[in-house]
Amino acid sequence: MEMEEDVRELLEYLAKSLVDHPEDVQVQETETDTTVVLELTVAKDDIGKVIGKQGRIARALRTIVKASAVKNGKRAIVEIVD
């Protein structure tokens, strides 16, 4: 579906902008009728960059992705895989 692609691409773009190894950024998506689960995988060296101090970057990423999904009537969950 087009909306999920937009949300996935948004998360991928944001993550690649934050890390030192953008070639290692991967986003896997799983969807149901109302929810999209996005699993973000980055290089081990970059995990701290996408989580941030006290999880602030991760929280910001989740907020942006959720806002984008809600606009299209879906719920988005971002999981950072280590």
Where are these regions (language model features)?
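RNA-contacting regions in translation and RNA-metabolism proteins
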Residues: M1-K49, A60-D82
